[in-house]
Amino acid sequence: MAAPKARALGPEEKDECMKIFDIFDRNAENIAPVSDTMDMLTKLGQTYTKRETEAIMKEARGPKGDKKNLGPEEWLVLCSKWVRQDDEEEILRAFKVFDANGDGVIDFDEFKFIMQKVGEEPLTDAEVEEAMKEADEDGNGVIDIPEFMDLIKKSKNALKEA
């Protein structure tokens, strides 16, 4: 498994991450020992190889960071990676459900089925076709996994802004 990329955390996500950090900040010194990282990862349901963990830790600490301890900022960098990974796994599971024939793409009929189920009112074929054109970034007539992830992320962002 490749180390996930970081993403910005919302206020609630930051609060949750810091609650976990506080558990590992045993002496209330605003630090958590790096040696506990594997334990932290396991308790959070994350499974990385030792090499992946070292790469994540190196990125979180930065070039001049403390090699033995993590501060709150470094912890939030780590947390942002896990949150993004969970989001992507959830989107991938949804994609597999919507890809009814399992061919790795969502075609017009599968997309129409999705749009009919999530919309409040039934859409016409023309409306579905227009929505599909917007989601189909490369114009090949189907929606692949990266396009589906972009579609979901855009939808989430639109809902947050509304």
UniProtKB/Swiss-Prot annotation:
| SMART domains the UniProt entry points to | EFh (SM00054)
Give the matching InterPro entries.
Answer: CALM/Myosin/TropC-like, EF-hand-dom_pair, EF_Hand_1_Ca_BS, EF_hand_dom
List modified residues, type N-acetylalanine: A2
What positions are modified (N6,N6,N6-trimethyllysine)? K96, K117
- Domain EF-hand, first and last residues per copy: 12-47, 49-84, 86-121, 123-158
Give the residues the record marks as binding Ca(2+) 1: D99, N101, D103, E110
Q: Which GO terms describe its molecular function?
A: calcium ion binding
Q: Where in the cell is it found?
A: Cytoplasm
Q: What is this protein called?
A: Calcium vector protein
Organism in which the protein naturally occurs:
Branchiostoma floridae (Florida lancelet)
